Amino acid sequence: MHSLNQKIKAFSRDNLRKQCTRVTTLTGKKLIETWEDATVHVVETEPSGGGGCGYVQDLTLDLQVGVIKPWLLLGSQDAAHDLELLRKHKVTHILNVAYGVENAFLSEFTYKTISILDVPETNILSYFPECFEFIEQAKLKDGVVLVHCNAGVSRAAAIVIGFLMSSEEATFTTALSLVKEARPSICPNPGFMEQLRTYQVGKESNGGDKVPAEDTTHGL
């Protein structure tokens, strides 16, 4: 008993090995959770980071490109940073709706960058006009446009679904099905899904393509 008491008194939290938990969210984000001073710290992994806990290199590449139309593609930042893959798909335009992802080949392609946060509170509808205009411009020039975000499952998918609802007069259900067939991993966050349903209601009630009045500001 005396020996046990000594060990308890000598115990120090500093002697514990630092633990970290890797978490992949429904939207495809990879996070690192660490404990420090009885508090959980969450950090998003950096593709170019080191091997330490908190910033780790993600070596898993997602190079699957969803071909929605011959001129409309959907993918991740990995696809957008693979020059050989882009040339294979004859990409001419790239719509980057990621947050904090740089455009890799400025001299090779026509870029449009719109930083969108992948959280349910973000007003995705307010970005539709600018995104749709860029896609239409690429189409009119007989180009091929790749729409991408970080993981290519939430933000970019929501933009493409909305575009099909706008330009192809597709219903939300039909557009979602078409995009999921081309890229099975898509999973727009719950807020985006609800806004896309609202977008359909607005189109039906307005008889056109207007964003509902309450959704015209950028929400975070």
Swiss-Prot record:
Keyword Ribonucleoprotein annotated: no
Residues modified to N-acetylmethionine: M1
SUPFAM superfamilies the UniProt entry points to: (Phosphotyrosine protein) phosphatases II
Molecular function via GO: JUN kinase phosphatase activity; MAP-kinase scaffold activity; mitogen-activated protein kinase kinase binding; mitogen-activated protein kinase kinase kinase binding; protein kinase activator activity; protein kinase inhibitor activity; protein serine/threonine phosphatase activity; protein tyrosine phosphatase activity
Activity regulation, short description: Phosphatase activity is enhanced by Ca(2+) and Mn(2+).
Pfam families in alphabetical order: DSPc
Keyword Magnesium: no
Start and end residues of each Tyrosine-protein phosphatase domain: 64-205
EC number(s) given by UniProt: 3.1.3.16, 3.1.3.48
Reaction(s) catalysed by this chain's protein: O-phospho-L-tyrosyl-[protein] + H2O = L-tyrosyl-[protein] + phosphate; O-phospho-L-seryl-[protein] + H2O = L-seryl-[protein] + phosphate; O-phospho-L-threonyl-[protein] + H2O = L-threonyl-[protein] + phosphate
An annotated GO BP: positive regulation of JNK cascade
Origin: domain of life: Eukaryota
GO CC, one annotated term: cytoplasm
Keywords of this entry: Acetylation, Hydrolase, Protein phosphatase
Active site: C149 (phosphocysteine intermediate)
Family to which this protein belongs: Belongs to the protein-tyrosine phosphatase family. Non-receptor class dual specificity subfamily.
Function: Has a dual specificity toward Ser/Thr and Tyr-containing proteins.
Name by which UniProt lists this protein: Dual specificity protein phosphatase 19
Biological source species: Mus musculus
Lineage: Eukaryota, Metazoa, Chordata, Craniata, Vertebrata
